[in-house]
Amino acid sequence: MAGDWLLVETMGREPAVVALGRQLKNFVPITVFLRRNPRLAAMQSAIAESLQTSQSLVSITPKNDRVIRTEPVVMSDGRIHGVHIWSGPAGAEPPERPIPGPLKWNMTLGVATDTPESLTNSGRNLEVEDPEGRPFAQSWPSGDLKPNEGRALAAAVRSEPGHTLCDTWDSTDWEGNHIRVSFVARNGLEPGPDGRDHVIARGMNWRAEPANPAQQTDRLAQRILHGLAQPGVHRALFDPSNWTLLKWLDEPCPFYDWRRVATDAPRMHPSDEARLAAMTEFAAGATGGVLRMPGHDGGWVPVHVTVSRVEVEQDTFAGLVALRLPTPAELTEAGLSESD
């Protein structure tokens, strides 16, 4: 183990190594990762005990020459997402432990649940960020598309049980400092509050090794994205099957309460749902119209919405939405007023 902590994800059929120290690993079964380690059985037993008790553990190997330490990674609902484990000479102190942050995304409802640890790792301000009931677009980094981000967006659109994902992204924290964050997630079916099975992505994140500020690998895509930006227009990617906002490409839209999607309140005026359903069929390419979206005061605000679709991965499409305030003529055509 080279003296580093191993982060072991424990939500699959077999515990899988997802990090060595701060270095990301792609769900390597622990029996493969430690196949030549004579303490494999002892470490498996330590992981199993931490899973059973939800407690940290310190144990000595049968020959009394090594110590094994474990730290469970427990989600706020009590579910264990993984176990940090370290083994070293008896009497030795382990290295500094990168603190994993457990997190959970309800892919069916479009609601994310973070923890103080996952928010800290993501560079968020704990004094203003609520870990519960977060819209996906609030948890997903806004702005430029990152290398390999299409895979994550495609996974969010497909929401397939059993799917796993791991990656490392460069970003900035709430104070503007460059950070690097690794994460892993696994989709599964769990009972939802409505009695149906929901697709739940459970995962962990942690701060990766520092690196130089990221150089975007797809500069052409970024130039196109920036070139199409317009003042007063706010673009985002969304899941066309349920209108869940996934990622803001521009600054988040300020004139309607897009965060209300994380509650039981309607995502738009009930009378406009049929119009939206027709728009998201994408039969005629880009389509647009005025929809009444949740206002910050609890009412409704008319918003001009243009939707199209974009291929985020081969044969997987997300919706692309552009939001702006409607013109008086567009309000009149829709039979609405600014106060509707």
Predicted regions and their residues:
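Non-catalytic regulatory/interaction regions at protein termini and inter-domain linkers
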Residues: 1-53, 60-63, 270-271, 333-340
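PAS-family sensory domain signal
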Residues: 1-35, 87-134, 212-264
